[in-house]
Amino acid sequence: MFSDTRPVLAVLGTVGDLSQAAGPELIEGAPPDLPSPEECVRVVPSGTFPPPFMGHVDLRLHPDDAAFATGRQSGKPLMRGWFRLPEDEPADSLALLCAVDAFPPTAFNARLPIAWTPTVELTAHIRANPAPGWLRCRFSTRFVSSGFLEEDGEVWDSAGRLVGQSRQLALVPQG
């Protein structure tokens, strides 16, 4: 993608048939512990934030992680919550790609400025086709340095299986 003559987006994709994936498994993590979706804070677009596309998904933030919206950053660079398509439409691999980039930046809870956090690189791994129902998501940051931060994401399906992972490198928001 170009803006005038300047490249602003490059995409590389590798695709395969997940139904043919087989092999040993070792899972050292677990789905995030979340209150029910009804007890979480629904993200609804208004103005420029959250962005208008959020009206096309159902995203619910853990109450502890949603407090940034009222000026109470937790100090922990963490975002957890539920994700699904509208009207409980079944999620597919494209929905998983949307889920890994739909949550607010973890920087919003890190006592950094709440501002544009531009993505430099986003890598997403689709590990399995998700079971029907809500997806549990967790995004965390361990390192903020030299003007960059990384955000690692996990997406778990209603059967408790890891179905997606992501790593996003972003610029630290400037206030």
Segments (PLM) and residue ranges:
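Terminal targeting signals and extreme-terminal segments of soluble enzymes
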Residues: 1-175
